[in-house]
Amino acid sequence: MGKLDVIQAKGTERLKRGFAKMVKGGVIMDVTNAEQARIAEEAGAVSVMALHRVPADIRKAGGVARMAPIEKIQEIMDAVTIPVMAKVRIGHVAEAKILEALGVDMIDESEVLTPSDPFFHIDKREFTVPFVCGARNLGEAVRRIWEGAAMIRTKGEAGTGNIVEAVRHVRLVAEGIRQIQAMTDDQVYAVAEKFAEPYLRLSLNVKEIAGLPQRVLDNEPIYGHYTYREIVDGLYKILLEIKKLGRLPVVNFAAGGVATPADAALMMQMGMDGVFVGSGIFKSSNPPKMAKAIVEAVNHWDEPDVLVEISKEIGEPMRGQDIEELEVRLEERGV
């Protein structure tokens, strides 16, 4: 491939998904400074996520959680040789443009930060940098993929050290895929129509305020320049690909609540392509040992005897939270 071809290929769906595949089978760790980034790299992380605070501290601090300071992200980028990701608020196109210009390797449009748009996620096809997005179920995953996400992750419930919501989301997506595979193409199209409904909310809201009929025409733009029927057809195409593959067509990581090597191994046993670890590393009593143990657990997830040794002398994991006691459920953000 010549230089011109490389330039023309930049930002294509194939290139974006190719980057995501490079981190497949690995661990991506949240870090808040250069020292933590170096600990993650030395432990074997395939990438780091640059944040101002880890999710547990974001949850504790309250208020509005935004993109990390540029100086902080740059400090982390300068400290390591592995890819650096950073988070933006759901729907915040300007934050994403800034991170793209800064040169991060991937952007996470994340429910961990305070959403900026109550109606839509970013149209990720408008960017050259690849995106990862969270999903609780097949509908959310397919919508994010149609919008251009190169990687999907479970939302879980970030900052809790509780794996239960990540398990829930893995099972919901897997069962959705199983049911799609049993459907006729006409039934799959009906599912695509159902999955497209969240894009109608803004248009229907405005019509309701104006006293107009609660109806959207097939040729009426409802998400950027995309019409309802174009969105349905796009979702249908992705669902047919899922039906054929028996899995999502992009890399699918676990995230939200991973706090121990056993949690990481469980996610891999459930069919995940890799693991994000947020608060679980640097809220543990021995971050370097916990980081290395979680990386090794992902590498040896199907070897119980090895997992026994990995789980020894790693210190105390982060203190977990009961999901039912939470005042704010981050996983419910987004559509």
UniProtKB/Swiss-Prot annotation:
Entry's family note: Belongs to the PdxS/SNZ family.
Catalysed reactions, as listed in the record: aldehydo-D-ribose 5-phosphate + D-glyceraldehyde 3-phosphate + L-glutamine = pyridoxal 5'-phosphate + L-glutamate + phosphate + 3 H2O + H(+)
Quaternary data: In the presence of PdxT, forms a dodecamer of heterodimers.
Single Gene Ontology BP annotation: pyridoxine biosynthetic process
Name of the protein this chain belongs to: Pyridoxal 5'-phosphate synthase subunit PdxS
GO molecular function per UniProt: amine-lyase activity; pyridoxal 5'-phosphate synthase (glutamine hydrolysing) activity
Active site: K87 (schiff-base intermediate with d-ribose 5-phosphate)
Pathway terms, separated by semicolons: Cofactor biosynthesis; pyridoxal 5'-phosphate biosynthesis
Annotated positions binding D-ribose 5-phosphate: D30, G159, G257, G278, S279
Principal EC category: lyase
Residues the entry annotates as binding D-glyceraldehyde 3-phosphate: R171
EC number: 4.3.3.6
Organism: Thermococcus kodakarensis (strain ATCC BAA-918 / JCM 12380 / KOD1)
Role this protein plays: Catalyzes the formation of pyridoxal 5'-phosphate from ribose 5-phosphate (RBP), glyceraldehyde 3-phosphate (G3P) and ammonia. The ammonia is provided by the PdxT subunit. Can also use ribulose 5-phosphate and dihydroxyacetone phosphate as substrates, resulting from enzyme-catalyzed isomerization of RBP and G3P, respectively.
Keyword Lyase: yes
Keywords: Lyase, Pyridoxal phosphate, Schiff base
